[in-house]
Amino acid sequence: MRPSSYNQRTLSKIASLQGVGLHSGARVTLTLRPAPPGHGIVFVRTDLARPVSIPALAEYVVDTSLATTLGRDGVRVGTVEHLMAALAGMGIDNLRVELDGPEVPIMDGSAAPFAALIQSAGVREQEAPKELLVIRKAVSVVDGDKQASLTPARHFRISCTIDFEHPVIQGQSFDLDFGDRDFAREISRARTFGFLRDVEKLKQMGLARGGSLENAIVVDEVSILNPDGLRFPDEFVRHKILDAIGDVSLFGRPVIGHMTAYKTGHALNHKLVRKVMSDPSCYEIVPARRRELEGMGLGFSGLAGALDFEPLVA
């Protein structure tokens, strides 16, 4: 019998891991706790005298200079994008994310450890349909030669291009169609990257304290410094897509639309999300039920790959 809706999801049990923060260098324990339908993803700083909850929503973004940082009442949670990408990529809607430090652990610099943690905990379907944010008209933002846009589509797709004047990176493009269930296989393992000259400057500023070749791709002027090289020939652009997925997930709902990104980063991704949210005519919130979706001209069965995720890790 065909399903009549795509329902919200949480974890089947509590799961946790430990790691260091990329910028703080602090040892942090991250714990994922199942949450009820409609709860959303909420970060909780448990290391404070009074725990502070910060919803994973665009309105709580307070910094995008080096990573995506959420904040509330003066309390911050940094580097949320890789975890958020894993949750979005594996269809998790409701979760309490506890941290005993200021930053989500960087792990290996990708989303794969978080995807594996989700897989180990198991996924539980809940008795409520997902709510989708359907893009209804084109929205774009520009910053110099950088640009990003969201346009109407039948499911979620990201087309990303980067262009660096560097012999190893240069120009790379990648197109991810969530209808093909490619996140775990094609994107989750792509690591963050940086230039050696920038890493040295950041460390002098007291940042990137937890950064190493174990959790980032580092390139000098001509080559990759990591002994094991790359996981994909185009790992750089794949990681940019991973970041974009994490940033766009701060809509608080799965997106139905096509994101096109050229030389974007966290700041421009967030600017795009905020611009969409500022104009209600740009989007529509729709329950992921067959009746409503087919009434909008969105093929219900065609969304299976984008919404009926399989918790698999390559």
From Swiss-Prot:
Which segments does the entry list as coiled coil? none
Q: What this chain does, per the record?
A: Catalyzes the hydrolysis of UDP-3-O-myristoyl-N-acetylglucosamine to form UDP-3-O-myristoylglucosamine and acetate, the committed step in lipid A biosynthesis.
The record, for Pfam families, names: LpxC (PF03331)
Q: What class of enzyme is it?
A: hydrolase
As its record notes, the protein acts as a catalyst of: a UDP-3-O-[(3R)-3-hydroxyacyl]-N-acetyl-alpha-D-glucosamine + H2O = a UDP-3-O-[(3R)-3-hydroxyacyl]-alpha-D-glucosamine + acetate
The similarity annotation says: Belongs to the LpxC family.
Name the UniProt record assigns to this protein:
UDP-3-O-acyl-N-acetylglucosamine deacetylase
| UniProt KW keywords | Hydrolase, Lipid A biosynthesis, Lipid biosynthesis, Lipid metabolism, Metal-binding, Zinc
